[in-house]
């Protein structure tokens, strides 16, 4: 069995890359989880139970990270020695900053007008932008452009926050 210190990719015997076969990840997760599930160690001693729990927790964390594209990209960059620094490094290219302001204004205007259709349209626009940026992120990671990939991750984190904010506004208006 792998070591608790192995990478998430090594744990599931998957290549350390952004593009990931979701069904292969799911299969690998189920295989590892079946081996380490604490129920298999119910009759074991306390030390073995504790180790099984550590493995189960580690397996779940690895799976949750790899199945989410943004977390997977952040993790890949971490493995490459790049700290995305989303909280400290908020500098973004001017065009993206302008786009951010437009999205925020659109949210404010639609929420003030109680216009759920406008919020839905904005959410669709954001999801389209997100898909395009994930494609770009994959290419950046594949080419080893790690600094640019870090910038792309920060932008995608922002897009996710804005999309969540739109969802909250839609929910508020629907109630």
Swiss-Prot record:
MF term (GO), any: protein-folding chaperone binding
SUPFAM superfamilies in the cross-refs: Chaperone J-domain, HSC20 (HSCB), C-terminal oligomerisation domain
Matches recorded under SMART domains: DnaJ
Keyword Cell cycle: no
One Pfam family per UniProt: HSCB_C
GO cellular component terms listed in the entry, alphabetical order: iron-sulfur cluster transfer complex
GO process terms (BP): [2Fe-2S] cluster assembly; protein complex oligomerization; protein folding
Keywords: Chaperone
Occurrences of domain J (ranges): 7-79
Matching InterPro entries: DnaJ_domain (IPR001623), HscB (IPR004640), HscB_C_sf (IPR036386), HscB_oligo_C (IPR009073), J_dom_sf (IPR036869)
Subunit structure: Interacts with HscA and stimulates its ATPase activity.
Family classification: Belongs to the HscB family.
Function: Co-chaperone involved in the maturation of iron-sulfur cluster-containing proteins. Seems to help targeting proteins to be folded toward HscA.
NCBIfam families: hscB, PRK03578.1
Protein name stated in the entry: Co-chaperone protein HscB homolog
């Amino acid at each position: 069995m792998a070591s608790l210190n192995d990478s998430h990719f090594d744990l599931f015997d998957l290549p350390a890359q952004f593009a990931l076969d979701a069904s292969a990840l799911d299969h690998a997760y189920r295989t590892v989880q079946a081996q380490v599930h604490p129920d298999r160690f119910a009759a074991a001693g306390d030390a073995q139970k504790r180790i099984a729990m550590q493995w189960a927790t580690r397996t779940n964390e690895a799976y949750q990270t790899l199945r989410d594209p943004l977390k997977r990209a952040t993790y890949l960059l971490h493995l490459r020695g790049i700290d995305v620094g989303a909280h400290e490094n908020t500098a973004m290219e001017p065009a993206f900053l302008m786009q951010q302001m437009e999205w925020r204004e659109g949210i404010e205007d639609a929420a003030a007008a109680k216009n759920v259709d406008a919020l839905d349209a904005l959410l669709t626009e954001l999801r389209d932008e997100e898909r395009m940026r994930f494609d770009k992120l994959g290419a950046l990671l594949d080419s080893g452009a790690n600094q640019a990939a870090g910038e792309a991750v920060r932008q995608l984190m922002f897009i996710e926050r804005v999309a969540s904010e739109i969802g909250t506004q839609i929910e508020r208006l629907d109630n």
